[in-house]
């Protein structure tokens, strides 16, 4: 694969970072995505508040938009279906926090930093004030809750456009960047990679990988709602005509979750720790201190 660097160089660097561990590449980025803010136009208009541009404004909007609607139903300012890294990273990073050091070898001092703890505290406090919900069994599914006016805001990806159009075609919503904090407006990087393992036909496998990341294949995938990672494909009329602009803008600052072998366990431990905080079993500092110690051990394995 003497042309690996040439092929990889034609793909978005941010997306390629998801296929890298310890400075070594293990594949090519295939597509990419990220999450942006979706908000209910009518709910914001009726409340007389502006779309939040900062995390402080976001927290304030969550409180003002929660309560009881005209039908006597409970409504919430924000819906979040989980407490994993995919869900929490935009808040942690935007508020200036982090999960590990740059080398991804240490969590203590990062995962339990004052900035990370502040992000978790904000989340927990909003939950305790009944301003956000979504991850508990029995909660209204995200698309239904948003489309029926029970949730005022979401952080979601491009797939939500088709879901809402199919289920609630008359529902009016708009999108905006992730509210910014001390760290800026930073969302989480998603998408898929394509890799070769123990193929008996390495040349054919590499040819297929190159085809899937070519301009032609990437434009075809864009027609199905996938955001291309091929830089040339991003400049085509087909891709520019798609409703990707808000996501592509957010991708300029989006970050990937730690590319470490222990990420699955790391992520599970993160969700468990934050659950303890939102349930009031531990303070954010206590939970993050304990979590940082656990993750240090995982990273050292």
Feature-to-residue mapping (PLM):
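Extracytoplasmic/periplasmic substrate-recognition and gating elements
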Residues: 23-24, 46-47, 121, 128-129, ...
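Glycine-centered hinge/linker elements that transmit conformational signals in sensory
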Residues: 62, 105-135
